[in-house]
Every structure is written in structure tokens, then in C-alpha cells.
């Protein structure tokens, strides 16, 4: 009888708590893209989105679904629970699940779709009386990611499970401090424990405006590999040195013209150096020997309106990395992507995107590996508004892709190909 009473009490308490939580609206957010397309040789042939642009250069189905709710708000104390799941597939058929399909004769397995837990965290505001606007958080989250949408990459992205404090006001801006875990997995097969624990300390200051229309942010992302005793004894890639990535950026809005430009300067060393030439945002390279590695990157991105109906978004990147692996001398990367849009009506527009890149990898022997390519896309789009980034959007596109150094298309027979398709994209 006592057990029944306890169970009943617990059930009532849970029901009451759920009723209390449901009095606050649930925040539903997300992103998705999906579509269909063909090329001159089978289905769509895509690649190098972060170098030549993503418009007309994506063939997958991808979605992120976020659900969050404020669960407590009293006397200036606020608690918020946030979550997000993602799914990705190649969009090849109707039923795409996580079921694994295996060909045991070939000892190969594949999955239709992959699902992932991307965010699950608690944010609390008002816990620090001296800093009532500061937010204390813990859990798994996207941490203040800095995005370049038209090339689908984040140049500053220290995300994962962790904890931190955001928006600590100081002077004209605010500090944010976080401890985030981002391990390197499956380094090699030399030992059983081949996953290396890596922790980041991330410190940022944002909000200083040196003059009208300007806005700045700067930060230090410090990576600390944390090997086990077995990994230390193994040495090499299992016992790398701490690395740092420094980021400084300035945004400028030019009143009257509507132009927005952002300049980003970055420096990184050790396992973080490869981000400077891979369009990465902060992952630590545990698969190469990087104790002598260093690199830097310059990014210029922005929006340029040309009249009431036409605008251009652009991303220019130059990066250089040295000693990124054994026998490596240096790698240089240049990438330029621009997307223009002309709004015919409030819901219809024409889009043009052009992108080019060139990468040169030099070895200590003097040998060079080069890669380069271009992409050109024309699209007709219908969206919920005239701006270039109004969403949802449905677009019909045609793309031409060119390999500047080899024959990577149409089964390795051609240095170019074309794609034609229809895609939808939305965020909310």
C-alpha cells in the first residue's frame, strides 16, 4: 500500500509539473533542405560547397529540429531547456531510416539515414546578482557559431558538450567563457583506446563599437588534449601539444548605402592550424603529427545592395598553413564565392552564384599537389519575401561545375559536368 501511495504521489507531482511547464509556449525552430536533381551522367554530382558555393550544389536531405521551453521564471530567475535533433540522407528513396542494410558477402554495411543529437542543454539567467543579464549554461549545444551561409561553413565553431557563462557585461561589450569537449575519434588501430579526449577553453569579448556602424568581437579558443596513461606511453598522435586559435573580427554597416561588410582575421597552431586551409571552424586534428603546425586566415564577407531589387552576398577567403603533417611544407588556399539576387516581385527572384578556388600543397621534397575548380549556377526562386535570405524558398536551378586539375566528373572521364534540379530550403 505504501508503494502505491508513493507511486501515486510521484505521478501527481509529475502531472502537475508538466501542467505548469505547458503554460509557457514551446519554441519550435529548425532548418531543412531537400530536393531532386540529375546530372549529365546519372544523379547529381556535387562537391566543394565550402569552396565554390552551395547553390545548385547540394543533393542531400538535411534537417535540424529544435524544441525549447522556458520552464521557470520567478523573481528575475529564468530557466530554459533547449534541444535539437538532426537527420541527413541522400534523398534516394521514400523510406529512409536508421536500419542498417548489409551485404555480408562483401562485408559492407550502409544506412539510409543518420540521426544525431545536436543540442540538449539548460540555460539560466539571473543567477548572478552582480550580473543579472549573464547566462549560465550546461549541456550540449551549438556554441556561438559564426556562419558563412552561401558556402555552408562555420569559421568559428567550438561546439559540443560543456558549460559556461555568457553575456558578462564589461565596458561597452560582454565576455563569454566556456569549457567544451570535442574529442578526436578513431585515430588509428595501434591501440584499443584510440579516442583522444580534447577539451577547449573558449574566451570571447563582443560588442565594442569603435565608431558609428562598427561592431567587433575577439576571442581565444584553447585546445587541451587529455591523453590516458596508455596513450601517453604510445606517444606521437596520441600525445599532441595544446593548441590555440585566435580570432578577431570587425563588422561595418555603411549608413545610406545599406552595405554590410565583415573582416575576419585568424591565427592557429598545433592541431588547430589545419582549420585555416580546410574552411574549418575549430576541430582539433589528432590524425596527423602537428606539433610544429601553424597557419592563418583572412575572410572578407558581406552584403552589397545595388538598388531596391538587386543585392550581392560574397565570401572571399585566403588561408595558409605550415607543417600540418609529416613532410609537409605549406598549403595555400584562395576561395571566392558571390551570389546575386534580383527580386522581380515580393515572392519571386532570380539568383546567380559563381565560385572559384585554388589550393596548392607543397611538400618538403619540393613536390606540389594542386587542386582548383569553379561552379556557376542560375536559379529561379520563389520565397516568403524579396530579400536574398527570405525563407522558405523553392528554387529551380541549373549548375555547371569544372575541375581545374583533373577529370573527377562523369565516372572519372570528364573535367566538367552540369546539374539540373529543384530544391526547397527553410529555417524558422
Swiss-Prot record:
How it assembles, according to the record, is: Homotrimer formed of three 18-stranded antiparallel beta-barrels, containing three independent channels.
The UniProt entry, under PANTHER family, shows: CRYPTIC OUTER MEMBRANE PORIN BGLH-RELATED
Q: Which GO terms describe its biological process?
A: monoatomic ion transport
User: What causes induction of this gene?
Assistant: By maltose.
Q: Which residues form the signal peptide?
A: 1-25
The text of the family note is: Belongs to the porin LamB (TC 1.B.3) family.
Name the record gives this protein: Maltoporin 1
Write out the function statement from the record: Involved in the transport of maltose and maltodextrins.
Identify the Pfam families for this entry. Answer: LamB
Predominant location category: membrane
Q: Topology versus the membrane, per the UniProt entry?
A: Multi-pass membrane protein
User: Can the keyword Ion transport be found in this entry's annotation?
Assistant: yes
What HAMAP family does the record tag this protein with? LamB
> Per UniProt, what is one GO molecular function of this protein?
maltodextrin transmembrane transporter activity
Query: Is Signal one of the keywords UniProt gives this record?
Result: yes
Keywords of the record: Cell outer membrane, Ion transport, Membrane, Porin, Signal, Sugar transport, Transmembrane, Transmembrane beta strand, Transport
**Site positions per UniProt: Greasy slide, important in sugar transport:** 31, 62, 427
Amino acid at each position: 500500500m505504501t508503494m502505491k501511495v508513493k507511486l501515486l504521489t510521484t505521478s501527481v507531482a509529475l502531472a502537475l509539473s508538466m501542467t505548469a511547464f505547458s503554460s509557457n509556449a514551446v519554441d519550435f525552430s529548425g532548418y531543412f533542405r531537400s530536393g531532386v536533381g540529375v546530372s549529365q551522367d546519372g544523379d547529381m554530382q556535387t562537391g566543394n560547397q565550402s569552396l565554390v558555393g552551395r547553390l545548385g550544389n547540394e543533393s542531400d536531405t538535411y534537417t535540424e529540429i529544435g524544441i525549447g521551453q522556458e520552464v521557470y521564471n520567478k523573481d528575475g530567475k529564468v530557466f530554459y531547456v533547449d534541444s535539437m535533433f538532426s537527420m541527413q540522407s541522400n534523398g534516394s528513396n521514400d523510406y529512409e531510416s536508421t536500419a542498417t542494410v548489409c551485404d555480408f558477402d562483401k562485408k559492407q554495411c550502409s544506412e539510409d539515414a543518420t540521426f544525431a543529437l545536436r543540442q540538449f542543454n539548460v540555460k539560466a539567467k539571473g543567477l548572478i546578482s552582480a550580473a543579472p543579464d549573464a547566462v549560465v549554461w550546461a549541456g550540449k549545444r551549438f556554441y556561438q557559431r559564426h556562419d558563412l551561409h552561401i558556402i555552408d561553413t562555420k569559421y568559428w565553431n567550438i561546439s559540443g558538450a560543456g558549460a559556461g557563462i555568457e553575456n558578462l557585461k564589461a565596458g561597452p561589450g560582454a565576455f563569454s567563457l566556456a569549457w567544451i569537449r570535442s574529442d578526436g575519434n578513431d585515430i588509428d588501430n595501434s591501440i584499443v583506446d584510440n579516442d583522444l579526449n580534447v577539451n577547449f577553453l573558449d574566451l570571447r569579448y563582443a560588442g565594442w563599437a569603435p565608431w558609428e556602424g562598427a561592431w567587433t568581437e575577439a576571442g581565444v579558443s584553447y585546445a587541451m588534449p587529455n591523453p590516458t596513461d596508455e596513450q601517453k606511453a604510445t606517444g606521437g598522435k596520441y600525445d599532441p601539444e595544446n593548441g590555440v586559435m585566435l580570432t578577431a573580427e570587425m563588422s561595418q554597416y555603411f549608413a545610406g548605402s545599406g552595405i554590410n561588410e565583415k573582416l575576419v582575421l585568424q591565427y592557429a597552431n598545433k592541431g588547430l592550424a589545419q582549420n585555416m586551409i580546410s574552411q574549418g571552424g575549430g576541430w582539433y586534428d589528432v590524425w596527423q603529427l602537428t606539433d610544429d603546425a601553424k597557419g592563418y586566415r583572412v575572410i572578407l564577407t558581406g552584403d552589397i545592395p545595388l538598388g531596391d531589387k538587386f543585392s550581392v552576398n560574397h565570401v572571399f577567403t585566403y588561408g595558409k598553413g605550415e607543417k600540418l603533417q609529416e613532410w609537409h611544407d605549406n598549403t595555400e588556399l584562395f576561395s571566392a564565392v558571390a551570389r546575386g539576387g534580383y527580386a522581380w516581385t515580393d515572392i519571386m527572384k532570380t539568383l546567380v552564384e559563381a565560385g572559384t578556388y585554388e589550393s596548392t600543397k607543397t611538400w618538403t621534397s619540393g613536390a606540389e599537389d594542386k587542386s582548383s575548380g569553379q561552379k556557376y549556377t542560375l536559379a529561379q526562386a520563389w520565397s516568403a519575401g524579396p530579400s536574398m535570405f527570405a525563407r522558405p524558398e523553392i528554387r529551380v536551378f541549373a549548375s555547371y561545375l569544372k575541375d581545374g586539375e583533373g577529370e573527377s566528373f562523369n565516372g572519372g572521364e570528364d573535367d566538367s559536368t552540369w546539374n539540373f534540379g529543384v530544391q526547397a530550403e527553410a529555417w524558422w
